[in-house]
Design a protein with these regions (language model features):
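Papain-like cysteine protease catalytic cores
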Residues: 1-84
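Active-site signature of cysteine proteases
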Residues: 61-226
Length: 226
């Protein structure tokens, strides 16, 4: 199981390509670790070093020393199924380079080009392929038809997402979102990259209305087991 949090998906993928991956079981010791507590302590280390006006090298040394104590020393190699990998080789075997593509649909940039997506979580300036909204929906549907998941980043307004039912719906008066409606929502900040989920399939109700099935990260104690 792989879990990445923070910023957007492509920022995390770039970190994987740059630094590699190490399975949790590759670390020495079998005692469970409280990841939340480790994160809080790491933040305290950073704040202390900032207060000391320490150099980046001093901060990295202090943080690495703490992480070695909390997690164990960083493994230089990964051993899995009788094969030895470096962290970068292991990452490439799990997430091959260019195995994901990012798409957006905005009219203030030209279509069919890589553009900078101006969204709060894209502070690493990742580029997205800008396509018309109909093309974007076709890409999503074609990937699902090929049994591939799609990472969705967007917002879940309280008046559109009913947690008790596990369903998100637009106003019933809106039969179809067109390019102009989407652009207005983006420019008015009524939609933005507040949350991310994996779209894994499609479904329909007895009236023929189409729904996209998305896996959430809020646990299994919600409708449809998450």
């Amino acid at each position: 199981r792989l879990k990445l949090t923070g910023r957007n998906l492509f920022f995390n993928l770039r970190l994987i390509r740059q630094y590699g991956l190490v399975p949790f079981d590759s670390y020495e010791g079998t005692q469970p670790r409280n990841v939340n507590a480790i994160n809080r302590k790491a933040m305290i280390v950073a704040q202390q070093k900032a207060g000391e006006k320490a150099t980046m090298a001093s901060f990295k040394n202090a943080l690495n020393s703490y992480l070695d104590d909390a997690l164990g020393a960083l493994p230089l190699n990964v051993y899995l199924f009788g094969v030895e990998y470096t962290p970068l080789q292991f990452a490439q075997s799990i997430v091959p380079a260019d195995s994901y593509k990012a798409y957006c649909s905005v009219t203030h940039h030209p279509f069919y080009r890589e553009v900078l997506q101006e969204s709060p979580d894209n502070n690493s300036y990742e580029l997205f392929n800008n396509v018309p909204i109909d093309s974007l929906m076709h890409i999503i549907d074609s990937q699902l038809s090929a049994h591939k998941a799609v990472c969705w980043e967007g917002s879940l307004p309280q008046d559109e997402y009913i947690m008790e039912q596990g369903v998100a719906q637009l106003d019933s008066k809106i039969s179809r979102v067109d390019q102009n409606m989407r652009q207005h929502a983006i420019e008015s900040y009524t939609t933005y990259d507040q949350h991310a989920m994996s779209i894994v399939g499609k479904a329909h109700d007895k009236h023929g209305n189409i729904y996209y099935i998305a896996k959430n990260s809020w646990g299994k104690n919600i409708p449809f087991g998450g």
